[in-house]
Regions:
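Alpha-helical transmembrane segments of multi-pass membrane proteins predominantly involved
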Residues: 1-527
Length: 527
């Protein structure tokens, strides 16, 4: 692709929200070298998110993609989600980090937010990979800055090397896609694969290899089994704030990329796709939930919780592949919208949980073990209520938001049996089995989530927790708890937004790109 296409006025205007956040990060990083320990960095970061949200509010889904940019409902949904979650993270980190490092930490947070937004709106492999690296590189820095003991440095190094490996595997998968289609633009790749669907040449094998490598590369980011093994050690070796960040942002960016590159750009490879996603969902749910039962370290427990919840989201991806997005049938749309709806619900509950942990502890005495929560429901009643809300939601107990999240992904899987295509409907038994395993996993998960509530309310109180994590972290917990309850009682608005993320335009139709200035057109090789 000619680099000048990124400078066309329409592309620049569409990318302004991401640009504002990245520019603020760069400004803070430069100034922090001369002005140390300034609280102003947090306010400047918050202001950049607010300005970005205002710019985003002026954007609407376009009838055409803008060159390398996907100007669709899915991009807008993910970008709003990222900004909202980013604001909560700023509140959690505000008092829990070393003031001398606040400039660097704020800047890294903003770069991660900008990168996630960039991936969500990418219609081009190079731009998408750039966004992924804009998330990964700041993550290395944050893990290094979080703590300075041996365990922390070991976990940071482990994540660094494995992340590099996953990026290499992902790029290898992208190279196969380029070789098959002759283009790096996702809509062109989808059109090429659709045009060659009846061709029984070796491209199907190459496409299958590309799909496996892309799932492997992105599976690392979403912590799907068997690419999950770094997560428990990395979460345990870092701070509560960093653990929350690791549990949420890589999943948001990972699923945004997975939806873009697989279910939207490679819908004709559903023969491989639904099987691969279904197997990953089964393994990820089961391994995550079973291993979480034996954990005493809270960050390690929520690492396995994060793994298990990635499995539930993969149910939606599997359903989308099974129905095949190019047909535009409701089941396919339900698969993707169920996944993105569940992603928001999971993110709120996880961020809220770590906000409570941050509030209850301090930099010197963080909340780390299950026993640290003993009696919290009596010594810190509001924190106990918030913790109960988040645990009930993660367990999928009505009427909280988590119930609707699980309901949506299970409903999407069962919807495969109702597909108009008889060959697709015949796959329904596999998805019934998937839902049964998912329900059993939900029961297993309830055991360790409800265990935390039992410890908080039915164990003798500990006097060691003073609630010194800062008002901002407490406020983040309250906001997340209120949203979890409100969405649970009235899920309609968020469900409608999730339902709208894939219009017929996005769902595999012939999507032209908006015109860009002469000489700036996408350069495509002949397949």
């Amino acid at each position: 692709m000619n680099g000048n296409v990124y400078l066309s006025p329409t592309v620049v205007q569409w990318l302004l929200p991401e640009t504002v956040v990245a520019a603020a990060a760069t400004l803070i990083l430069v100034l922090a070298a001369f002005l140390r320990g300034r609280a102003a960095w947090w306010w400047l970061a918050g202001a950049s998110l607010a300005v970005s949200a205002l710019l985003l509010a002026g954007q609407t889904p376009q009838a055409q993609n803008l060159g390398p940019v996907a100007a669709d409902s899915l991009a807008i949904y993910f970008r709003y989600t990222t900004l909202a979650l980013g604001a909560l993270f700023l509140m959690i980190f505000a008092r829990s980090v070393n003031p001398a490092q606040s400039g660097e930490i704020v800047a890294m947070l903003l770069y991660m937010i900008s990168g996630t937004m960039l991936v969500a709106g990418s219609d081009e492999l190079v731009l998408l990979f750039l966004g992924l690296e804009l998330v990964s590189i700041p993550t290395y820095v944050l893990l290094y800055l979080g703590r300075h003991d041996v365990a922390s440095q070991e976990s940071a190094a482990k994540y660094f090397f494995l992340s590099i490996l996953s990026s290499a595997v992902l790029l290898y998968g992208f190279s196969f896609l380029y070789g098959i289609s002759g283009s790096t633009q996702l809509t062109t790749i989808a059109e090429t694969l659709r045009a060659r669907a009846a061709d029984q040449s070796s491209w199907h094998i190459l496409g299958g290899l590309a799909l496996v490598m892309i799932f492997a590369g992105l599976g690392f980011r979403i912590a799907a089994v068997p690419f999950h093994f770094y997560a428990p050690d990395v979460y345990q070796g870092t701070t509560n704030g960093n653990a929350a960040l690791m549990a949420v942002i890589p999943k948001v960016v990972g699923f945004a990329a997975l939806i873009r590159v697989t279910t939207l750009a490679m819908p004709t490879l559903e023969t491989y796709g639904w099987r691969l996603a279904l197997i990953l969902a089964l393994l990820t749910m089961t391994v995550g939930n079973v291993l979480a039962l034996w954990q005493d370290n809270l960050r390690r427990l929520f690492a396995y919780s994060s793994i298990a919840n990635a499995g539930y989201m993969l149910i939606g991806i599997a359903a989308a592949f099974a129905v095949n997005l190019q047909t535009g049938t409701p089941g396919a749309l339900n698969g993707v919208d169920a996944a993105v709806f569940y992603l928001v619900i999971y993110s709120l509950a996880t961020i809220g949980t770590f906000a409570v942990f941050t509030w209850l502890g301090s930099r010197e005495r963080p909340v780390e073990h299950v026993s640290d929560l003993e009696g919290v429901g009596r010594t810190h009643p509001i924190s106990g209520i918030m913790l109960a809300v988040f645990m009930f939601s993660l367990a999928g107990i009505p009427p909280l938001a988590g119930f609707w999240g699980k309901f949506e992904v299970f409903f999407a899987a069962l919807g495969v049996r109702e597909a108009q295509d008889a060959s697709v409907a015949g796959l329904g038994n596999w998805f019934v089995f998937l839902v049964i395993v998912g329900a059993l996993n939900a029961a297993i998960a309830a055991a360790y989530y409800l265990r935390l509530i039992g410890v908080a309310y039915f164990k003798p109180a500990r006097a060691s927790l003073k609630g010194e994590g800062g008002l901002a972290a407490f406020t983040a917990g309250v906001v997340a708890a209120v949203l979890t309850v409100v969405i649970g009682l009235a899920p309609g608005p968020l469900l409608n937004k999730a339902d709208a993320v894939l219009t017929p335009l996005d769902a595999g139709q012939n999507i032209p790109s908006a015109e860009v200035p002469a000489g700036d057109q996408v350069v495509q090789a002949q397949p």
